């Protein structure tokens, strides 16, 4: 279908044409035929890179032009939110105001009342509904992106909760290919539009070693075969693809494997032609950013100089952004990543090599599970870059020829797993009901039950969980019942607004009410022990050290030592997190923290963000519970966690551009507060440099005026 044939105003057509798009592709054409531009409710399922974002844009713009109101585009990841925001900014040229919001769950974001198109995450939208802002009533068109996240064990409950509310209004749902799309479409009250079309044809295959040393065969889906030679299967196929001027994405099942594989590949990159000027610019970018440990930067620099990088959640966001952008611009030729990359931003390559189909099982030591088919489809879907590649290749590496048939049948020839509700646990279901009551204000038992029946859970499962949830939430003072109507207690409403799990809130309340004011390590351990606390890897040797440390702590912990093995593992995990955070707030150098606890800079950032949220929540819960001894300490602790400083630097880190290192530099040179900054501008400029120093002096003066 030609763009000119669309029933859209000429200025809308022009924006699409300015992107170089003259014709709609098959999924886009099918969506238009099914009434996309008439506001029809649709569920579109198609592979990665098949143009779903343009479908959403056309649906939103057409709907808003006809009906007014607001459109909300929801994604499962912050990185995707940013990506979609940049795309939708194009529509500001014809008068639509576009905004993006994520994080900071304890706010109603009143500023969004002035915007027409809002890009956000599922968690953020869920939290906004709990705050009941008036502007959200104007939202009458929802795009639910990556709806297959309903099947994600961690994110699924929130995605389902948001979907239950959103499907009461106008809706466009977008998803990767799912096997039970007709069932999901019926649940949404939407018409299904299912297609397997891809912009670049995909060749899928399995690679196995021959008896002949250093020889590997790749058997493709169309029964063709190819042989490659080399010291290692992954390296051999990577070099084969690079020799044809392709880029390569290699997926490994752990961070260590990603890093070691990248190092191995780098040793073979001498024959690959690189843009040395571009590589130098990338290396300079790495030097310029403050985020990230020096060791990981040096390792990345040595790899990038050879056209290779690794990518995993342990890296800081700034480092990941540089790697992704350099790969998009074809400056980096190979990325070795963990599967988190496949679930995130769009980063296609000619060749995708899946080095492992097994994942470490966190619950059973030494046990590995095979990856879900959906995870394979997400990884293989990155193969083939539109505009650069005529074909994409996705290869699974197996250790033995005998595995080929089984792997072919399970991953290449099979449908993905059907989507099923992830609300079927006490933690998820209780949180869901709390969120619904917070958003609605008050509901009768039948009304509340009706929301639960709108989930994907079987009615029999809802019946089991509903009574149990109501009883637990009532007994623990989250909800109250009067005249057969349920409302939240003040405590329950505060918990819902803070966007923490009710089980987390209950653990915090018991910990604070059971003890008098305590020390930092005890507060940090309590919060890390909750269901919302961050998880870190604790090795066998570390366990022994942590057990010894328990006997030498400066104060009594606020959580009793558990007897069950699983609970005790979480108890030690919480202690490791608490120790990391104690070093952080005591201004221990970041490189030292990363090395001491064997974590990456991205891990540290995630731990800090989570503990920032939990210390903030604990402070506000202590205020709600009138536990003044605790609240004073928790307020200071939260501020210190936010910036990673001792209490004496809290005034200085309020100044924009002054982080923990610069604040310490100023303090150690006699600049101990805002007044000192304003009274000693020359000394500040000498310490921080003329440009930054001047900005800091002006900002300090502004803050002083505001306080007085």
Curated annotation (Swiss-Prot):
SMART domains for the chain: DEXDc (SM00487), HELICc (SM00490)
Domain Helicase ATP-binding intervals: 33-196
GO biological process, one term: DNA repair
GO molecular function list: 3'-5' DNA helicase activity; ATP binding; ATP hydrolysis activity; DNA binding
Residue numbers covered by motif Q motif: 1-29
Pfam families xrefs: DEAD (PF00270), Helicase_C (PF00271), Helicase_dom4_arc (PF21280)
Uppermost EC category: isomerase
Sites where the protein binds ATP: 28, 46-53
InterPro entries: DEAD/DEAH_box_helicase_dom, Hel308-like_dom4, Hel308_helicase, Hel308_SKI2-like, Helicase_ATP-bd, Helicase_C-like, Helicase_Hel308, P-loop_NTPase
Reactions listed under catalytic activity: Couples ATP hydrolysis with the unwinding of duplex DNA by translocating in the 3'-5' direction; ATP + H2O = ADP + phosphate + H(+)
Motif window: DEAH box: 145-148
All residue ranges annotated as the Helicase C-terminal domain in the record: 229-435
Function in brief: DNA-dependent ATPase and 3'-5' DNA helicase that may be involved in repair of stalled replication forks.
Record family assignment: Belongs to the helicase family. Hel308 subfamily.
Cited PANTHER family: ATP-DEPENDENT DNA HELICASE HEL308, DNA POLYMERASE THETA, PUTATIVE (AFU_ORTHOLOGUE AFUA_1G05260)-RELATED
The protein's name: ATP-dependent DNA helicase Hel308
Organism name: Saccharolobus solfataricus (strain ATCC 35092 / DSM 1617 / JCM 11322 / P2)
């Amino acid at each position: 279908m030609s763009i000119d044939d669309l029933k859209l105003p000429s200025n809308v057509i022009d924006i699409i044409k300015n992107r170089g798009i003259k014709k709609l592709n098959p999924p886009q054409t099918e969506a238009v035929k099914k009434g996309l531009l008439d506001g029809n409710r649709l569920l579109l399922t198609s592979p990665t890179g098949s143009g779903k974002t343009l479908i959403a844009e056309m649906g939103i713009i057409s709907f808003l032009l006809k009906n007014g109101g607001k459109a909300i585009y929801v994604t499962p990841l912050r990185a995707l939110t940013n990506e979609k925001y940049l795309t939708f900014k194009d529509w500001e040229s014809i008068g639509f105001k576009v905004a993006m919001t994520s994080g900071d769950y304890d706010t109603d974001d009143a500023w969004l009342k002035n915007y027409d198109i809002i890009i956000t995450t599922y968690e953020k939208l869920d939290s906004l509904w709990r705050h009941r802002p008036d502007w959200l009533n104007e939202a009458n068109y929802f795009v639910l992106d990556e709806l297959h996240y309903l099947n994600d064990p961690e994110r699924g409950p929130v995605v389902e909760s948001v979907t239950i509310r959103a499907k009461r209004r106008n809706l466009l749902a977008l998803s990767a290919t799912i096997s039970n799309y007709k069932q999901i479409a019926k649940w949404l009250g939407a018409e299904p539009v299912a297609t397997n079309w891809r912009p670049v044809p995909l060749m899928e295959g399995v690679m196995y070693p021959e008896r002949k040393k250093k020889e590997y065969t790749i058997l493709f889906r169309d029964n063709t075969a190819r042989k490659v030679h080399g010291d290692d299967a992954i390296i051999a196929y990577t070099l084969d693809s690079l020799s044809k001027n392709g880029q390569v994405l290699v997926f490994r099942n752990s961070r260590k494997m990603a890093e070691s594989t990248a190092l191995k590949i780098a040793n073979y990159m001498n024959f690959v032609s690189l843009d040395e000027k571009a590589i130098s610019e990338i290396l300079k970018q790495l030097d310029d950013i403050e985020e990230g440990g020096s060791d990981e930067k040096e390792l990345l620099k040595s790899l990038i100089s050879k056209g290779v990088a690794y990518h995993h959640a342990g890296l800081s966001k700034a480092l990941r952004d540089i790697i992704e952008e350099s790969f998009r611009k074809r400056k980096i030729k190979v990325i070795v990543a963990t599967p988190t990359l496949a679930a995130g931003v769009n980063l296609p390559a000619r060749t995708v090599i899946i080095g492992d189909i097994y994942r470490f099982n966190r619950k059973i030591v030494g046990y590995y599970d095979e990856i879900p088919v959906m995870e394979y489809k997400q990884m293989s879907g990155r193969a083939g870059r539109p505009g650069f590649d005529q074909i994409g290749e996705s290869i699974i590496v197996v250790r033995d020829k005998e595995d080929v048939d089984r792997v072919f049948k399970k991953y290449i020839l099979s449908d993905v797993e059907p989507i099923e509700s992830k609300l079927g646990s006490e933690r998820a279901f209780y949180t869901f009901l709390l969120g619904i009551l917070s958003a609605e204000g008050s509901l009768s038992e039948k009304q509340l039950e009706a929301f639960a029946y709108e989930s994907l859970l079987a009615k029999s499962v809802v019946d089991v969980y509903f009574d149990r949830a109501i009883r637990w939430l009532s007994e623990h003072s989250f909800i109250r019942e009067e005249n057969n109507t349920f409302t939240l207690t003040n405590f329950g409403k505060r918990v819902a607004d803070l966007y923490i799990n009710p089980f987390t809130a209950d653990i915090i309340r018991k910990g604070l009410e059971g003890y008098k004011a305590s020390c930092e390590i005890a507060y940090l351990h309590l919060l890390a022990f909750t269901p919302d606390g961050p998880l870190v890897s604790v090795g066998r040797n570390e366990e022994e050290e942590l057990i010894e440390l328990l006997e030498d702590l400066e104060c009594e912990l606020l959580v009793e030592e558990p007897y069950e093995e699983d609970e005790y593992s979480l108890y030690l995990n919480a202690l490791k997190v608490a120790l990391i955070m104690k070093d952080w707030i005591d201004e221990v150098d970041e490189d030292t923290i990363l090395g001491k606890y064997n974590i990456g800079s991205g891990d540290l950032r995630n731990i800090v963000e989570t503990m920032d949220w939990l210390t903030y929540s604990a402070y506000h819960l202590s205020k709600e519970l009138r536990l003044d001894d605790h609240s004073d300490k928790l307020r200071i602790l939260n501020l210190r966690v936010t910036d990673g400083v001792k209490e004496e630097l809290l005034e200085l880190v309020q100044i924009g551009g002054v982080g923990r290192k610069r604040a310490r530099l100023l303090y150690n040179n006699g600049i101990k507060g805002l007044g000192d900054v304003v009274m000693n501008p020359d000394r500040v400029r000498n310490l921080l440099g003329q440009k930054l120093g001047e900005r800091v002096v002006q900002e300090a003066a502004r803050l002083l005026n505001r306080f007085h």
